[in-house]
Design a protein with these regions (language model features):
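Metal-dependent phosphoesterase core characteristic of DEDDh/y 3'-5' exonuclease domains
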Residues: 58-77, 96-211
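Conserved non-catalytic scaffold segment of RNase H-like nuclease domains
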Residues: 1-114
Length: 211
């Protein structure tokens, strides 16, 4: 059985990650102290805005899964440790299945594992040495066809003719103000992953209509 999955993340509060911020050094041609401080302030703000992209500075908001011929379901808990424990328990109960994602080998699984470590959550045996086990298929790697070419889920969905509108509100903000819309967005993404996987011949075909 092919199980499609994806995650959404958010940056941790500034006071929790400030000590992890790297020291930014302005280019050597910057001589004016005011310009140097402005440059550093900009880099620091960019770092905070990008906090959700690293397990050092971000956390898991929710995990979406979609089993064949079923609606998407979600692991969502304000307590990240509980969320991770629930997901890994689900994985253990379905470890003979294949988990299909987009960017899952390069981002999703590493993020889940690293956040599990910091939350002291036991991680199943999903590695073969330094590589992931064969349980995971990353459609971004499949798209690469042996090259390092990357793309986004949005671009690939559009490439294959899916109606995929960009978010007008950052997901993290949507999660706070409109949880229902946020979950619908996650459902859209896992269905897009399954549909793209079908086109690529990676995932068994389902009889569903893309809306």
């Amino acid at each position: 059985m092919d199980i499609v999955f994806n995650i959404e993340t958010a940056g941790l509060p500034k006071d929790e990650i400030l000590h992890l911020m790297p020291e930014f050094t302005a280019p050597s041609n910057y001589k004016d102290s005011e310009k140097i401080q402005t440059w550093k302030a900009k880099k620091q703000e960019e770092w905070f805005l990008d906090a959700s992209s690293s397990a050092l500075s971000g956390k898991i908001l929710a995990i979406a899964i979609q089993e064949p011929f079923k609606n998407a379901s979600f692991f969502a808990d304000e307590n990240e440790k509980n969320l991770l424990q629930a997901f890994w328990e689900y994985y253990r109960n379905h470890c003979t299945c294949r988990f299909v994602g987009f960017g899952c080998n390069s981002f999703v699984i590493p993020f889940l594992v690293r956040r599990s470590w910091v939350n002291r959550v036991a991680v199943p045996n999903i590695f073969r040495g330094r590589f992931l086990s064969g349980n995971f298929t990353d459609l971004m790697q499949v798209w690469g066809c042996g090259t390092s070419e990357r793309t986004t889920l949005a671009n690939l969905a559009k490439f294959f003719g899916l109606k995929y509108e960009p978010l007008e509100t950052p997901f993290e903000a949507m999660w706070i103000v409109n949880r229902e819309s946020a979950l619908k967005t996650m459902e859209r993404d896992v269905l897009a992953i399954r549909y793209i996987g079908e086109i690529m011949g990676v995932v068994a075909e389902e009889d569903f209509q893309w809306e």
